[in-house]
Amino acid sequence: MADVCLRLQYACPWQSNMAAHGRQPVLSSTPLQILFHLNGWYFAAFFVAEILMFIYKGVILPYPQDNLILDVVLLLLFSGLETLRLFYGWKGNLCQRSLALFVSVAILVPCAVLSVYYLLLQTFVLRLEFVLNAVLLCFYGFELVLGVMTISIFSRANIY
């Protein structure tokens, strides 16, 4: 009877720290994966809100045309970088690859710089933009800390 209970205990994946098909521990960071998922949805809403705010600024405010074009091009660049960052972070965490996760952390730097640009350095910064970018920078801070911790865990593990 004790042998059956022992087998049932380790048959449940949430009670064991080992991978299903092997005996290697699962090192992926669940909080980091949750942050990647939430940040993906948040950035999609952020992108739509920024586009709508640029339309508002272009129509209502005396926004210089050259600055508006520059800000929209930077937003498109920001979107591409964020997509790459989330992809490499997502795959690096789930596949337990420190190089892909390092690329994600490296791409985090230009994304944070672009977020600071939209937070402080535009011609007109709306309050909504300030709040949205401040929340995005909080996401980046948490992802940086968890990403560096996860990279160190992956680097110390003996995965063959």
UniProtKB/Swiss-Prot annotation:
Disulfide connectivity for this sequence is none
Q: Where in the cell is it found?
A: Membrane; Cytoplasm, Cytoskeleton, Cilium basal body
Among the GO biological process terms of this entry, one is: non-motile cilium assembly
| Assigned GO CC terms | ciliary transition zone; cytoplasm; cytoskeleton; membrane
User: How would you describe this protein's topology in the membrane?
Assistant: Multi-pass membrane protein
The superkingdom of the source organism is Eukaryota
Q: Does the keyword Transport apply?
A: no
**Free-text disruption phenotype from the record:** Ciliary phenotypes such as pericardial effusion, hydrocephalic brain, curved or kinked tail, gastrulation defects and other severe defects in left/right axis.
Main location per the UniProt record: membrane
Residue ranges spanning the membrane: these are 41-61, 68-88, 101-121, 134-154
* Record keywords, A-Z: Cell projection, Cilium biogenesis/degradation, Cytoplasm, Cytoskeleton, Membrane, Transmembrane, Transmembrane helix
Q: Which InterPro entries match?
A: Uncharacterised_TM-17
Q: Using the record for this protein, list the coiled-coil segments as residue ranges, or answer none.
A: none
UniProt subunit comment = Part of the tectonic-like complex (also named B9 complex).
Role, per record? Part of the tectonic-like complex which is required for tissue-specific ciliogenesis and may regulate ciliary membrane composition.
Q: What is this protein called?
A: Transmembrane protein 216
What species was this sequence derived from? Danio rerio (Zebrafish)
Q: What gene makes this protein?
A: tmem216
